[in-house]
Amino acid sequence: MKRNQTQSSRFAILHIFIALGFSAILSSCYILNKTDDFYFLRPEAQKRVIPTTGSIDELKDDRAIYLINAQQVKDYCKQHSNVIIYNFSPSYTLYKNLNANDFVDMCKANGVNALPIANSYLELDKVRKLGVPILMIHHNPYKTNKWRRYTKLFYKDVTNSNKRINNSKRFFSFKNGVYIGNFSTYEEALKSLQ
């Protein structure tokens, strides 16, 4: 009888630890979505963040993290015949998340202008050199630091579309400055330009 009580109290303690661990994970995810993830960058990376209002074509691949606005992206799309924008999350490593470097290489191989735009600072400082400038959504105009919200608002401005922006569809294609569509895969976005 005493043995069963000891065993059940061990299970109770185990369940408490599992519940606490699960709660900690959920609350950290909640906090990351609610706080400005800029402060998760290392201090030396924070110094590399540069707000810019000029042409994207003038930016250099120099390890700086350039904050851009929707108008800069629209201007870039008007200046180039075929553009695919990749709305990427540097820390998002789930299945089917395309590496930003691979995206740039695939676009170059297909004669398409690549525009990878990060939607979060989380691990952005760990992205290896892309061959194009590292671009980040400047979220201040949207008066929110919640990445899901400012990402939707940013792409709504970029596309000039009243359609709902789905954050899981990470590729946006433009032909001669005209928004074609929002796609789940690079292949779908590329096909839309042909």
Regions found by a protein language model. Give the residues of each.
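Thioredoxin-like thiol-disulfide oxidoreductase module
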Residues: 122-167
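Bacterial signal peptide processing site
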Residues: 30-33
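C-terminal motif of bacterial Sec signal peptides marking the signal peptidase cleavage site
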Residues: 25-28
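Structural microenvironment flanking redox-active thiols in thiol-disulfide oxidoreductases
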Residues: 85, 96-136
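Post-signal peptide N-terminal segment of mature Sec-exported envelope proteins
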Residues: 39-58
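A short, hydrophobic beta-strand/beta-hairpin element that forms part of a small beta-sheet core
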Residues: 166-182
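Short active-site neighborhood of thiol/selenol oxidoreductases, capturing the structured segment around
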Residues: 74-102
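N-terminal secretory signal peptides that target proteins for export/translocation
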Residues: 1-12
